[in-house]
Amino acid sequence: MNGDNSVESGGAYSAGLLSQVNDSEKMVNNTRLETTDKTNIVTSGENAVGVLACSSPGESRTCVDAVDDEVSDSNSYEVISRADLKMNGGSITTNGINSYGAYANGKKAYINLDYVALETVADGSYAVAIRQGNIDIKNSSITTTGTKAPIAKIYNGGELFFPMSPRYQNKIKEYQLMHQISILKPK
């Protein structure tokens, strides 16, 4: 997507931008969605997602299923295809209850946000959600204003990459130990 763009979605479980792949184990079917200029995304439905990358999240799961505590989500085949979503500039705003600003769902789901203002404003909404996938955030701002609306929910082996100031490194290490998650600095 080139140029200044505006994306709005208003339904439950909707996604502003979606990069999705479902593997067959027989051939690589990578998907890639990239914005090169300012793109503004607004979602207003419950359980909606601003940007979603999904790569075979499990045979019993769909791409829009919530990040939950279910462990048995494996595939009977090797996941070989990637779902990539890269956003350069702009904003993501979610207004619906239990929504995610950016969601990487599946072992080969990758989201890269650079110069993006990410904001969730409803109760139970997470700025970032990861289930086995990877999200890399650089030069961006993250805000959550709803009740029970943490910055990130990461489950089942996901990774979040973002630059950290020394001031927050100890708090993040403590959080990692408490929740057994991986938060890594960019390469």
Which residues does each PLM region occupy?
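Surface-exposed loop/turn motifs in large extracellular/passenger domains
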Residues: M1-A48, L52-G124, A129-K148, K153-I172, ...
